[in-house]
């Protein structure tokens, strides 16, 4: 019986038992590059831009309709800055088959609404809606970065990235203090933090003078100085809040990767 079991049964093995020392070193080297990619690719646009740069370094050229294609030619096609196709031209017709590998570059996140900015209780916020199947309670009281693009009235596309560098400000979705949350903690995990409650805190200092929405005005003034943005430009912007944590190694043996 043992003989036929060993022949027919599948016995899972630890992957580290299946590689030698040289392969282990290669795995570590690859993962360090992967961590660098994750740190600089927080959105689809950033992932695609970084992938294009890597492709160019490896001999890929942008595909143009009508261009000459020969076996071995490496081409890429970027779809609206958010999707990427890479191809290596083969020797035979597609009728003979092709090897296709696919992957997604989007991830759960908190997006800004089209008219997101408002002031209440002398604090300024961005209204948001979440993308993907997030656990909403994981997104409160953690530092967040703002990534994306805005299209100004003159058609200029402005890249925005705030909070990635150590000396830049970050943002937060607030939560109740423990001693004020007696009713909240009785709710289920899905109900404790609502989608409507995921509002991004972005400022608290008022613009000098008198009148309404002075904190909102101060924040808008700062954004206008930095990027030339007015409130109307948010209608044609695509901005997302993502965790402001660097990717890191997990465990005493550094064998796992943790990060967004």
Q: Could you tell me what each predicted segment is?
A:
Residues 1-260:
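N-terminal hydrophobic/helix-forming segments and targeting peptides
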């Amino acid at each position: 019986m043992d003989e036929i079991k060993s022949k027919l049964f599948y016995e899972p093995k630890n992957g580290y038992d299946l590689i030698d020392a040289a392969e282990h070193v290669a795995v570590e080297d690859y993962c360090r590059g992967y961590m660098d990619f994750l740190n600089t690719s927080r959105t689809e646009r950033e992932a695609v831009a970084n992938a294009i740069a890597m492709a160019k370094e490896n001999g890929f050229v942008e595909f143009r309709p009508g261009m000459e294609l020969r076996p071995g030619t490496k081409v890429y096609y970027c779809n609206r800055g958010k999707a990427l196709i890479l191809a290596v031209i083969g020797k035979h017709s597609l009728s003979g088959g092709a090897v296709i590998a696919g992957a997604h570059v989007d991830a759960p996140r908190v997006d800004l609404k089209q008219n997101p900015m408002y002031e209440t209780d002398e604090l300024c916020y961005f209204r948001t809606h979440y993308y993907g199947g997030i656990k909403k309670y994981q997104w409160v009281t953690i530092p967040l970065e703002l990534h994306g693009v805005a299209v100004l009235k003159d058609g200029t596309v402005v890249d925005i990235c705030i909070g990635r560098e150590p000396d830049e400000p970050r943002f937060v979705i607030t939560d109740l203090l423990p001693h004020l949350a007696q009713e909240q903690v009785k709710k289920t995990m899905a109900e404790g933090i609502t989608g409507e409650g995921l509002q991004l805190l972005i400022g608290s200092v008022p613009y000098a003078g008198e009148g309404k929405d002075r904190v909102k005005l101060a924040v808008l003034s700062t954004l206008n100085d930095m990027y030339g943005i007015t409130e109307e430009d948010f209608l044609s912007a695509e901005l997302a809040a993502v965790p402001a944590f660097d990717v890191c190694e997990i465990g005493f043996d550094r064998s796992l990767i943790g990060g967004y």
